[in-house]
Amino acid sequence: MKHLHSITELSNDEIMHTIERAIMIKNGEIKRYENIYTANLFFENSTRTKCSFEMAERKLGLQVIPFETSTSSVTKGESLYDTCKTLESIGCDVLVIRHPENNYYEQLHELNIPVVNGGDGSGQHPTQCLLDLMTIYEEYGKFEGLKIIICGDILNSRVARSNYHALTSLGAQVKFVAPEIWQDHSLDAEYVSIDDAIEEVDVCMLLRVQHERHDEDAANFSRVNYNRMYGLTRERYDRLKEEAIILHPAPVNRDVEIDSELVEAPKSRIFKQMENGVYTRMSILSQVIENNR
């Protein structure tokens, strides 16, 4: 792994290597790096991904260059490429970027330093996908044959897209649950009712309703109706298999995608995902650093 733009760039072996390395790091096998400089360029708001990357970088001994888009020359019209080329020129070794434009990284092929994608529009979120995979693998020790539903705003979700590609490649059976207006038929997955699927799934992955990516739909959105038709309610939770787990990339709209009381219920792994995000990103960054030396 010399960079990470999309989960589709990785073979199954590379995915498994990244997960296994993350588990080793979690168990205390941490290699620290000297004189490696990184910058995190987040052009969309973020709590988990941005802080998780910074924690991963600091645990690896990396020097993190502060960068805030609101006080940078981006506000003066500087292009993404020129911003990144500037950071390369002053000595950054790795860039982590989140950007609202799908496939923004295609503008950056002339850079001589690696880019790790922290999320591009509704395109890809490879590091979130890999931490989700790590969390599933810790529970089941496999992907082959697992039954997984991904519930919510599929059309606007980079998390759904990345997870669908990786999980199906690894042998899991993935189905979607979504209102018709938020379905994405470019992904060759079956759409089902949550009530028809809930009793047989091994993993119930919930997605945030992304109000900021909607227009006229937002005015017609009903939290109560969404929760009733598509959300994980207590009644649905009680129908899950004993060993089933719940995932959510967060932030969580409580009482919309999931009843508030279930966010930290025994089957929930939502905060475990956040913990694993640090180890997964340490695994990714260490591979990128070592493969670009």
Swiss-Prot record:
Coiled coil spans: none
Residues where carbamoyl phosphate binds: R48, T49, R98, H125, Q128, A250, P251
Any one GO biological process: 'de novo' UMP biosynthetic process
Top-rank EC class of the record's enzyme: transferase
Molecular function (Gene Ontology), one example: amino acid binding
Catalysed reactions, as listed in the record: carbamoyl phosphate + L-aspartate = N-carbamoyl-L-aspartate + phosphate + H(+)
Pathway: Pyrimidine metabolism; UMP biosynthesis via de novo pathway; (S)-dihydroorotate from bicarbonate: step 2/3
Disulfide bonds: none
PROSITE patterns noted in UniProt: CARBAMOYLTRANSFERASE
UniProt keyword annotations, A-Z: Pyrimidine biosynthesis, Transferase
One Pfam assignment: OTCace
Cellular component terms (Gene Ontology): cytosol
Complex and partners: Heterododecamer (2C3:3R2) of six catalytic PyrB chains organized as two trimers (C3), and six regulatory PyrI chains organized as three dimers (R2).
Xref: NCBIfam families: asp_carb_tr, PRK00856.1
General function of this protein: Catalyzes the condensation of carbamoyl phosphate and aspartate to form carbamoyl aspartate and inorganic phosphate, the committed step in the de novo pyrimidine nucleotide biosynthesis pathway.
PANTHER family cross-referenced by the UniProt entry: ASPARTATE CARBAMOYLTRANSFERASE, ORNITHINE CARBAMOYLTRANSFERASE, MITOCHONDRIAL
Protein name: Aspartate carbamoyltransferase catalytic subunit
